[in-house]
Amino acid sequence: MAVPKKRTSKSKSRSRKAKWKQKAYNAYIKCVSLGKSVISGKSKSFIYIQQQTEKNL
């Protein structure tokens, strides 16, 4: 027989939402930091293959 579920409290739902937002913010900070290091050329976690190609027109 189907039984209705109890309602989730506001504090629990807000806590879950805050946790999700914090995880997203941490991922954003990590991405921005990595992007800055790649742009500045100080990144140690990537191997850059520099190819010089010449096009004869």
From Swiss-Prot:
It comes from Gracilaria tenuistipitata var. liui. Keywords: Chloroplast, Plastid, Ribonucleoprotein, Ribosomal protein. Belongs to the bacterial ribosomal protein bL32 family. SUPFAM superfamilies: Zn-binding ribosomal proteins (SSF57829). It is found in: Plastid, Chloroplast. It comes from the Eukaryota. InterPro entries: Ribosomal_bL32, Ribosomal_bL32_plant/cyanobact, Ribosomal_zn-bd. This is Large ribosomal subunit protein bL32c. GO terms for molecular function: structural constituent of ribosome. GO terms for biological process: translation. Disulfide bonds: none annotated. It holds the Pfam family Ribosomal_L32p. GO terms for cellular component: chloroplast; large ribosomal subunit. Its main location: plastid.
